[in-house]
Amino acid sequence: MPAPVNIPSMFDTILVLDFGSQYSHLITRRLREFNVYAEMLPCTQKIAELPWKPKGVILSGGPYSVYAEGSPHVDHAVFDLGVPILGICYGMQELAWINGKGVHAGEKKEFGHATIHVEKPSDPLFHGIDNFQVWMSHGDKLNALPTGYEVVATSDNSPYAGIAHTSEKIWGIQFHPEVTHTTKGKQLLQNFAVDICGAAQKWSMENFVDTEIQRIRDLVGPHAEVIGAVSGGVDSTVGAKLMKEAIGDRFHAILVDNGVMRLNECENVKKTLGEGLGINLNVVDAADLFLGKLKGVTDPEKKRKIIGNTFIEVFEEEAAKIQPTHPEAGEIEFLLQGTLYPDVIESISFKGPSQTIKTHHNVGGLLDNMKLKLIEPLRELFKDEVRKLGEIMGIPHDLVWRHPFPGPGIAIRVLGEVTPSQVEIARKADFIYIEEIKKAGIYEEISQAFACLLPVKSVGVMGDQRTYEQVIALRAIETVDFMTADWYIFDANFLKTVARRIVNEVPGVARVVYDITSKPPATVEWE
């Protein structure tokens, strides 16, 4: 069986070396937006251990001072690769530091907008770019031009806002082209990746899908079987569809009904995945088991642990019942996991590896318990790329663009004890809310929206009768990366319609409120 080929060996790749900047992942995203594949690794990466050669290297920004003890520094072997290099902010200061030139704390720090003056329009990095607005975020600055470099751009506070060593094809810039505040940053990155590095613009989901299907076949082989949990969300659905295309019915999808899913979710998943996409689907009704274990529990972290641990128990039990799909089929050897590239970035960032990569529904324990190997067909992709891939593979548009739904489900949208009656109130209110959002044609403008049931009661009036019933809180946010988020501004008449429907159609609700808290200080979910 041939060894699976990694993606950077199949596409021209720009290597982004991360020095811990909060913007590092955006460099990778921007490059992919113009169809150049980019991969991020920590700045401590040993170049000799890299199994592929990049077309170019970008040194990211970072929160450190290059001259301070313990600050990170790049492997000098990167300069022996013979490929173009671009240093951004800290990355530029690293270039100067290695060159032996001074970097010092600036008398005036630059944070926010600044104007860049292009001093050498003929420089290939600034080709087609006039003076433009950029985003600065640095306290240190160069106090001398490194040997062999020339100034190609300045700002009012920095005589070395852009420097170039033309013969070595090395550039440094003191601003962040990857953020949207930099008006021509994407063009600058494209100048570097495409024009200077010569990277072919072939990265697309159309090209990825066949490549990934073949990679799955090479990894799994002709006989092994694969299991994976599905939830009705876009990540697990796209992953399951890829497995179906690659190995057919040797992939077994398991849907565990934990009693805290959205209204009619199980039926919808069976119809979409099983009937519509032809995926080999096993459905387990474990609602009573989950709700029984949640009885009396109010702490949100305990809810999460109970749901996660119970899921593992149910999944293992169901997996043991799965029979081979044909006489030549082998053992179940692999577990599908919906890891995305942001999860990978979180685990390798120079800020320090996270304790665990986030796992779908807390299935990480299954690997040890069941002696399974992991298969992660989406681990190179950002969320927008997963959605695009889903559409290419014929997954219904409404499913591809579905809002995220937490693994613990409605259990963390019922604040307080989770009971069948409380779940029913929360899911009915949520259904009405989402239905009205879709009717208004604004569903895809909103990153995430949901209703949650608060553990308080409120006085109301229905007809001539006084009521004393529960409160529903509505939440809707807009975000790019879910690290920060703003609350969505609805039309007042829309909120009036939703509130009226929920109070009239959901027994037990007397009041509806709308959450107008941004993230931070609040999180997206209430629990």
Curated annotation (Swiss-Prot):
One of its GO terms (biological process) is GMP biosynthetic process. SUPFAM superfamilies: Adenine nucleotide alpha hydrolases-like, Class I glutamine amidotransferase-like, GMP synthetase C-terminal dimerisation domain. It comes from the Eukaryota. Keywords: ATP-binding, Cytoplasm, Glutamine amidotransferase, GMP biosynthesis, Ligase, Magnesium, Nucleotide-binding, Purine biosynthesis. The keyword Lipoprotein does not apply. Residues 203-402 form the GMPS ATP-PPase domain. Pathway: Purine metabolism; GMP biosynthesis; GMP from XMP (L-Gln route): step 1/1. The active site is at 89 (nucleophile), 176, 178. It is found in: Cytoplasm, Cytosol. Residues 13-202 form the Glutamine amidotransferase type-1 domain. The keyword ATP-binding applies. GO terms for molecular function: ATP binding; GMP synthase (glutamine-hydrolyzing) activity; GMP synthase activity. Pfam families: GATase (PF00117), GMP_synt_C (PF00958), NAD_synthase (PF02540). Homodimer. Catalyzes the conversion of xanthine monophosphate (XMP) to GMP in the presence of glutamine and ATP through an adenyl-XMP intermediate. This is GMP synthase [glutamine-hydrolyzing]. The gene is GUA1.
